[in-house]
């Protein structure tokens, strides 16, 4: 069985850079830990892409799931045939998500 694909949109890549940088201001080790935990979470999500809730009020085909243990949510789309996911954004819960999609 092939591993599912995990694609990052340019905005998601930028989100990760900004989140990691923000965490690193206080604790560089914690920032590295965050990135590792995020990678593990994304693998789990790609293997189980339907576990997130649908978000039709934001965009067609969009789903979201909270990143457990953090105040962030992951917004993603399932690749046709459920062969993987495209991460659209990773956003803090305090953000006005409706304005960002």
Which residue ranges define each predicted feature?
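Basic, Lys/Arg-enriched alpha-helical interface segments
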Residues: 1-62, 80
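Enriched for short, Lys/Arg-rich terminal
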Residues: 67-101
């Amino acid at each position: 069985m092939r591993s599912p694909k995990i694609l990052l949109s340019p905005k998601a890549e930028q989100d990760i850079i900004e989140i990691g940088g923000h965490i690193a201001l206080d604790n560089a080790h914690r920032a590295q830990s965050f990135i590792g935990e995020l990678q593990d979470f994304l693998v789990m999500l790609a293997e189980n892409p339907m576990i997130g809730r649908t978000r039709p009020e934001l965009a067609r085909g969009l789903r979201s799931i909270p990143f457990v243990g953090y105040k962030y949510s992951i917004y993603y789309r399932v690749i046709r045939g459920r062969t993987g996911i495209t991460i659209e954004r990773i956003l803090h819960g305090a953000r006005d998500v409706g304005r960002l999609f």
